[in-house]
Amino acid sequence: MKLIVKMATRSRPEKFKTVLQQYIDFLSGENEVRFVITCDLDDETMNTDDMREWFEETRKSVDLVYRYGHSKTKVEACNADLEDEDGDVLLVVSDDMIPAAMNYDSIIAQGFAEVFPNYDGAIKFNDGLRNDALMTLPCLGWKLYKAIGHCYHPDYTSLYCDDEQTRLCGMLGKLAVCEMIIARHEWIPGDHENADDLHKRNESYYGVDGEVFRRRAENNFDVDEVRERLGLPVPAKS
């Protein structure tokens, strides 16, 4: 299995380095794994000579590419820099998704071999925080990812994008659930005493993104178009 691990980051260089190194250290060595990192050119904490040197040193021991761009939103950053990539599974992580299982790549490989051997589905792993069906750690077969056309729908800024992703995969009949925790979601609300400016900014979009979600839901999240791209039967319109 070839696993693409996508990570977008901003304004948290030390936390980012710690978490990324954990993702590297927790690999089994049994699968092909490539890390794709997206940073912002206007981020003075990440766009530094020291950070670039750290990236170059890390690249000596792992397949990793890092790119600096002009992402205007969290969703845009998550979607960025994947257009020239290819793999079997896409795993989208962040610096608040802390690795919790050694050999997580082999756990993912085994899961897809069991439920989506053609890599045309998604697996929702328990994130250690929520008990509902929401997939907060996107783990998408590459065929499904390409059929959808993005990780998160680009109309969103920060929030509700995972709600759409989860519902769309469920509507397609392409969502499996695994109670194993491969990464623990250490999320804190924007009003928490430890919340930084990025937390607060990302959580300020509830109203805007909530309206996007309602509008997208009225259109069934374009599920029929995705069905067609996957080669699934499309129900006749009444």
Explain the meaning of each model-derived region:
Residues 7-18, 41-43, 72:
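Active-site beta-to-alpha loop of glycosyltransferases that engages the nucleotide-sugar donor
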Residues 21-32:
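Short, acidic, metal-binding catalytic loop of nucleotide-sugar glycosyltransferases
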Residues 31-44, 67-69:
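Short beta-strand/loop segment that forms part of the nucleotide-sugar
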Residues 37-51, 97-98:
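A conserved acidic beta->alpha catalytic loop
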Residues 79-89:
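Active-site nucleotide-sugar/metal-binding loop of Leloir-type enzymes
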Residues 87-98:
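Short beta-strand-to-loop acidic/aromatic patch adjacent to the donor-nucleotide binding site
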Residues 97-98, 102-135, 142:
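Conserved donor NDP-sugar-binding/catalytic core segment of glycosyltransferases
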Residues 159, 163-238:
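C-terminal catalytic/acceptor-binding lobe
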